[in-house]
């Protein structure tokens, strides 16, 4: 009914809050199609981050009353510019460390929290010795049973929790440093056939382009 007058701006306040998950997901695509056809700006108020990521073309993240980053959902999620943004959108593992090398094609971070060295395949134009954080999303970590020996991007820990979600499982890993890390893996095998179980020793590895290096 609100679209009959062809407004320039339409405010939607928790429009999908009363719907179940499947209907909510279907309605998200319907709202996107309507907005695309009409070309009207929609401002959506929601407490559901997945809903915000799905419906938005631009997201603004505020911290202490100031906008700290504006970008597409992909930019906000994959390339946060601060720890606050990385932690606010989705789930993230943050490893504090010291910059050992900073070259145009890579950086090397020594992290006591990770219990090893973190190699990233791009430079950040900062001085060696600087305090930095490596942000690593749970789904970008590969989990294997047993202990592997790699020069970097390989840390060890013990499985302390497993949450079976149907299409995926969330693993809570206690690193040897004492830090807890979250890992998300798709369930490609049936639950009874899963290789990794509670209290197993595991290795966590990731690609060099997976972490984002943050200075603040």
Model-identified regions with their sequence ranges:
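Short beta-strand-centered aromatic/proline hotspots
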Residues: 97
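Non-catalytic connector elements of ABC transporters
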Residues: 92, 102-216
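A generic structural signal for ordered secondary structure
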Residues: 12, 35, 53, 60, ...
């Amino acid at each position: 009914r609100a679209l009959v007058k062809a407004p320039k701006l339409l405010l939607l306040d928790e429009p999908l809050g009363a719907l179940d998950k499947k209907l909510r997901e279907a309605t998200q695509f319907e709202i996107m199609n309507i907005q695309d056809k009409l070309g009207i700006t929609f401002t959506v108020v929601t407490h559901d981050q997945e809903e915000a990521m799905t419906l938005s073309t631009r997201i603004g993240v505020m911290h202490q009353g100031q906008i700290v980053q504006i970008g597409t959902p992909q930019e906000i999620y994959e390339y946060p510019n601060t720890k606050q943004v990385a932690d606010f959108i989705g789930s993230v593992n943050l490893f504090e460390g010291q910059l050992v090398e900073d070259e145009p094609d890579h950086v090397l971070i020594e992290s006591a929290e990770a219990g090893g060295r973190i190699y990233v395949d791009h430079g950040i134009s900062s001085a060696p010795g600087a305090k930095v954080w490596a942000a690593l999303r749970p789904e970008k970590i590969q989990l294997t049973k047993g202990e592997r020996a790699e020069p970097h991007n390989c840390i060890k820990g013990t499985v302390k929790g497993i949450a079976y979600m149907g299409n995926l499982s969330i693993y809570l890993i206690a690193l040897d440093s004492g830090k807890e890390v979250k890992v998300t893996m798709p369930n490609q095998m049936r639950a009874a056939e899963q290789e990794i179980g509670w209290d197993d020793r595991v290795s966590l590895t990731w690609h060099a382009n997976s972490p984002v290096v943050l200075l603040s």
